[in-house]
Every structure is written in C-alpha cells, then in structure tokens.
C-alpha cells in the first residue's frame, strides 16, 4: 500500500525539519503538515488530506493552528505530484438522488448504518486478528511464511487473484459498469485483514475504498436506488468509519466525485461515523483520544478544586 508509506514519509520529513530549524513548540503542527503533504500528494485530494491529518492523530480534537500549514503543504504536494505525472482518480457519477422521496431518505439512513458497521467490522477484526495471530504463532517469520502459503492458495482459488492488491480493480468495476459480485466486499475485507494481521505491511485506505464501493453497488441494487451513487457514498463512508474520521471522508467524496450528491454524502458519513463506536485501524489515534479525555477530566477536576477553594475563602 502507498498511503501509509506516503503519510509516514511526510511525517518523518516534517519532524526532522522541525528539529533542524529548532521549533519544538510547533512539532505537532509540523507533523500534521507532513502527513497532509503525504496524503495530498498521493491522492491529490488536498482538502481531504488536511482534515485526515488533523483527525487521524486524535479524533474529535482539531488543532486549528495546524490548518493553514497543512493546507499549504497539502496543496503544494498535490500540485507537485500532478506536475510529475501522477494521475488523480476521479469518477463522474452523472446521477443525483432525489431527496424529496421518502424512500431515498430511508435508504440513506440504512446506508449510513451499514457502512459504519462495516468500517467498524474492518477495524475491530483487524485488531483482534493481529492479537490472535501474534499469540498463536510467536515467530513472525514462521507466521508470515506459513499463513502466506495458505493465503496465496485462497487468493488464487477465489477468481484467480481478484482480491489481491489494493482493490483498484473493484473500484474500477464499480464506477465503470463492470462486474461486482455480492460477496466481493466481504472477501476483500477478509483477505485484507488476514494479510495485515499475519505481519505483512500494506495499505488499508485503498482497500477500504474498494470494500465501500463494491458494498455500495450491492446495497444500491437491494434498496432500489442508484448503485453508482451508493458506491460513491460507500467509498467515502467505510473509509471514514474504519479510520474514525468525519470531515476527511466528506472531503474526499467531494473531491473525487463532485458536489452533485453532497447532502447524501454528508448524511451517510455522519451516520457511519456515529456507528463506528470510536474504533479505528490506527491504535495510536485511540490512545490520543483517551489521553485528551484524561486531560479534559483533569481540567474539570482542577476547576472544581479552584471553586471549592474560592468558596472556602469566602466563608
């Protein structure tokens, strides 16, 4: 996968730049800017990159001082990669959901819940599987070697490698009127989780896009609304749920698919975010949330103590 690598490279470069120019007080801002540059340069979605970098460190907490530096780095990176020949993925939907229909409104609610649960399934299963695999086979080389043989056989048996790689083949099929099977999303999810759990290093973001898009096609057909619009909604919302981010999936949906279905996109992404239960594929993000919650509690306790002192002094 490229996303994880790109973000990590951007983060390391920005961190080292901050140290070199001796600005430790801006270390977190430099980190956000570097991550935004990595994401923005890869996907050429600078707005999504900015909010992804800000949200992925600590969900529910935004460091607004990092907004302008992150925007500068993300747009510069996206422009540079474009000049160097990297093509941005975009899809013309050409269809718009009619929000005056009750059926469409109810379908959006179902989609938001569905995509949220699937994103949660991905992140939760990944963390659980990593622990189980690590406990079952302690030696990482034996674990990777033994399970990889089994995995390779399965990948070959199921449509000759259809579920290997990043999943761009499923994304293309979803938006180019290709063949999407009803079980594509679950097999892609299972194989991706197993591959990462045994110790292979790879990306999660693009596979999440493919899982969401293929699930969206299935859901759209079952609900009787535009499958391609549902694929676009799933593309963004499953990613948002699995990464425990809200603004980033909304922005990536707008930048990749346009603004025709902006309201359905926002509604579905909000519902998916609410359904994920705080679960994330990035465990460091979860620790940051706990730390921030602890800080908030500490502040509240200090505030209560000060009030008690003031009351005692008045008495």
Which residues does each PLM region occupy?
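Alpha-helical transmembrane segments and immediately membrane-proximal extracytoplasmic
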Residues: 2-315
